């Protein structure tokens, strides 16, 4: 009877060993006119590593020679078994050689692996700072939700651009007068590619991209990855999942529906907590069509990739008045009104969003693990037989062929003469066109590519293939 109280007391004592951000930095994360640099943040990560809920991992050196930190957070019991949970995550993601029964058994044993990063675009300072606050709360809180998250999730909290945070924070904080501090950094915040570090995750030219890709695609293969960015569209607080169409047509449908499900959990949590201003789908410009970034490349590894773009700056700002955004709709069900906005509000929103994702992963742990196996198995099966991906140009070909045939036969275009039930639709086309055009053998998906050595971009092709091999 005394065991549970003693364990709880021990957990509280463990949490008390970790200093709060204010105790360590001298200010709260999110205070106006205050930023930490990476040297300070990394030193704080080492303080957090004193907790038995954590393991601090150096995932490699940056382009400027800094150590890139990843803090793994879970329950003390899970921390002792990280190798096993990593092995389960890899086996389910690879899917090869597993039966459904074996996959379900592994899914029941494993833990949801969730990646949360921050700081990739260093001038988007909410990202790196929400990471610090989230780490602290996960390491020190003992409420029921946090303990359930720690029990069911292995959380990979990763700094995406240490060099950039060092540069940007030092530049902003160089002014003694807080009112003179500005985010007008005069040079790139990644040594070679600056903002385009988020265009490097299919080629991995930069060391940071290589470090991150190894953890994502080789070591851990998380079921969910969450990439924090800025800025939110004018008249909103943030844009998040689900995203506007089109998505890439080759995705497994489970990618799309899982993004919808996690996005709903994120939006719902903010609404429960009285945090308005979340916009989705047509409310922003973000989609899943382009696939070379930190959030989008993982889709091809069957991970649920999440992106939020939030407002916020250590220098207070104002939420813009965009009249059309004040009317609730499916994209923005809970609009935000114009107001002054403080850095801490963005930190609080970000922590809430992280908790929404982690709570979802904890609640649906075994399903997430099984789903990534199922997507992997679907991909293997798809590669073993002929498969067609339908693109708009093929749909246009059907319409063109049908119109041509109708004209040639001088048929009445107002009638459906296919003998197939159309339920009043005027765009119904006889099914024979599906086989004749959409299933044309010429349009089959490729199962492999032959690259002749004399083609002009052969070195680029070799580089790309090596990048694929490196990333698993």
Residue ranges and their predicted role:
Residues 272-472:
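Hard-cation-handling environments
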